[in-house]
Amino acid sequence: MAKGSKGYIVGVMGPVVDVKFPEEELPDIFNALEVVNPQTGQKIVLEVEQLIGDGVVRTVAMDSTDGLMKGLEVVDTGEPITAPVGKEVLGRILNVIGEPVDEAGEIKSKERWPIHRPAPELIEQSTEIEILETGIKVIDLLAPFPKGGKIGFFGGAGVGKTVLVMELIRNIAIEHKGFSVFAGVGERTREGNELWLEMQESGVLGNTVLVFGQMNEPPGARFRVALTALTIAEYFRDVEGRDVLLFIDNIFRFVQAGSEVSALLGRMPSAVGYQPTLATDMGELQERITSTRRGSITSVQAIYVPADDITDPAPATTFAHLDATVVLSRRIAELGLYPAVDPLDSSSKILDPAVVGREHYEVARGVQEVLQRYKDLQDIIAILGVEELSPEDKLVVHRARRIQRFLSQPFHVAERFTGRPGKYVPLEETIRGFKEILDGKLDDVPEQAFLMAGTIDEVKERAKEMRS
């Protein structure tokens, strides 16, 4: 298809715009078209979704269509929407079409990549299953992240999701020399602004790219912004050979945006009014997130569950792609235990002795067993008190309370608020610490010594100070 072909608008239906071209100059599916809004003088990008006959193509706008009218000239760029890639985009905020929105000047990147790209061929993909060490005890022990895997974050407002995300970004940047890409998909602009300011203050912005298509933007932008972020991450993986963390907040909004444009494109809705192409849309995004021989993209996706119904098609389709789930619990946050990760609800497919090793597996299962037994005893304790328990059950409660507190840990990005220096805990230290608690070697150590500690050696030091 020749670049520069010209057509004109023949219909505008909200974010969907119909454009007529000469029959011999029809643009390809997913090509980006450009039209100038006569009211604002701004260039609006339209993405071709369907060829509907008689030279007419149906497109979805990446910006508001207010001011567009029939007869306006439209130019075919001859290529899909492209995103700037490379180190020049680090520390910047972009929109869906790769334009900077942080008022920090133009992005002078040497390359731009199309946002529609095939997933890596099977022969290019890495078949080794490897743990991505995060330095966060509760995650590394109970819900280990596979390198190149997909992790779902579940949690309501105010349970520490953003702080956990920022700590992951910091640890990947400093401990793994990796980069992070954050895709804000259909979330609040205020939250995006707060994240940007917090990243500046905590010093992680320089290793991160932020790509936003927020709640106030048209569905086309919200639907495609995750692909823009993923393309930037793919460059760091494939060209720079890095381990990249890709955060998508929120994957449900990606589905929701697709559902909004689907009916306008004339598609028959499927279950619960979602688009009939739901599984395909999700698959095209998720299959590109993987490890190759050069590097990896590990994706952490916040998942909003509508009306707490996990059978809803949007979250249900997402679950099929996940390798691990991290559930943040308000009950744990209220106890003042951070990160507020629920150790019983969180899980990982790679928590298997064949992958993580026999010792890691047995310690993790031992921790969950003690915590589950403690949870089962809660009702009895509430009615009768701890004194009425059998000696074995008292020992379970005794160790469970120490495990609960040892699962907490101070974060580097929260140092300014807590006054406690952050701790990165290597996986071997995490396993050793919990093994000693399970073996009863620390039964005489006071509970307070375990709270907000890093390694088990730090707990022992604190216990010595308390006794002296």
UniProtKB/Swiss-Prot annotation:
GO terms for cellular component: plasma membrane; proton-transporting ATP synthase complex. Keywords: ATP synthesis, ATP-binding, Cell inner membrane, Cell membrane, CF(1), Hydrogen ion transport, Ion transport, Membrane, Nucleotide-binding, Translocase, Transport. ATP binds at residues 155-162. SMART domains: AAA. The keyword Membrane applies. Its EC number is 7.1.2.2. InterPro entries: AAA+_ATPase, ATP-synt_VA_C, ATP_synth_F1_bsu, ATPase_a/bsu_AS, ATPase_alpha/beta_chains, ATPase_F1/V1/A1_a/bsu_N, ATPase_F1/V1/A1_a/bsu_N_sf, ATPase_F1/V1/A1_a/bsu_nucl-bd. It catalyses: ATP + H2O + 4 H(+)(in) = ADP + phosphate + 5 H(+)(out). Transmembrane segments: none annotated. GO terms for molecular function: ATP binding; ATP hydrolysis activity; proton-transporting ATP synthase activity, rotational mechanism. The keyword Ion transport applies. SUPFAM superfamilies: C-terminal domain of alpha and beta subunits of F1 ATP synthase, N-terminal domain of alpha and beta subunits of F1 ATP synthase, P-loop containing nucleoside triphosphate hydrolases. It is found in: Cell inner membrane. Belongs to the ATPase alpha/beta chains family. Produces ATP from ADP in the presence of a proton gradient across the membrane. The catalytic sites are hosted primarily by the beta subunits. NCBIfam families: atpD (TIGR01039). This is ATP synthase subunit beta. It comes from Thermotoga neapolitana (strain ATCC 49049 / DSM 4359 / NBRC 107923 / NS-E). The lineage of its organism: Bacteria, Thermotogati, Thermotogota, Thermotogae, Thermotogales.
